[in-house]
């Protein structure tokens, strides 16, 4: 097992937003714009349709003609500090795990989706009757929490382990959940798709499902070095064996109890 000390690489400060601003329609749109590296127009318009659930509206995205002609999907790519958690309160359910992504970069699809949805609500167009009473001025927006997006719809997703100069390993995430939950937070990319627009009173959010997680297959651990500084140590000798045996995984609190949140949790969709 190799133990290669890697010095931390200083990165430029990431955009930040106050919790209050992220709970307004204008604030969440501006934040999503700030983490987008492009303003290329992707979305022509969005339609919210009534669903079988009173509080949920399905989301239909119409891409620009140029993107539609290329058969472009409506998936959204994110990048950020990523951690898979066990959900203590739901261990016997299909959503026994969830992904937390502290987003540092996002496709312009994200801000344009938010912009289109709340533009529809503001102008009372392309929305079901159940949303006509909403005002963008009084909505408490919950898509982001602590600058993070939480995803508990993981079924059917794939995980791709990547390493520079080597072939990637692609697997169904169902068989990787336990080992991934034991990893420390690390930078990763995620491809997600919007599921529904959810409303509870004046609280609203767009919920997402994971389609693919792209993560470095090297397992690292944070240790306190001889100098007293925190260092990242590679614990990977053979990637295939490590993935199977969960080597190099540190003992951390890898469980998160949503019920311990002081705020009343918004409906998980």
Swiss-Prot record:
Keywords of the record: DNA condensation, DNA-binding, Early protein, Host cytoplasm
Major location category of this protein: host cell
GO molecular function list: single-stranded DNA binding
Gene Ontology CC, one term: host cell cytoplasm
Induction of the gene: Expressed in the early phase of the viral replicative cycle.
Key word Lyase present: no
DNA-binding among keywords: yes
InterPro entries associated with the record: Poxvirus_I3_ssDNA-bd (IPR006754)
One of the protein's GO biological processes: viral DNA genome replication
Localisation per UniProt entry: Host cytoplasm
Misc remark: This protein is synthesized in the early as well as at the intermediate time of infection.
Quaternary structure and partners: Homoomultimer (Potential). Interacts with the small subunit of ribonucleotide reductase. Interacts with host FAM111A; this interaction protomtes OPG079 degradation through autophagy.
Role summary: Plays an essential role in viral DNA replication. Binds to ssDNA with high affinity and localizes to cytoplasmic factories where nascent viral genomes accumulate. May disrupt loops, hairpins and other secondary structures present on ssDNA to reduce and eliminate pausing of viral DNA polymerase at specific sites during elongation.
Family: Belongs to the orthopoxvirus OPG079 family.
Name of this chain's protein: Protein OPG079
Organism: Vaccinia virus (strain Western Reserve) (VACV)
Gene (name only): OPG079
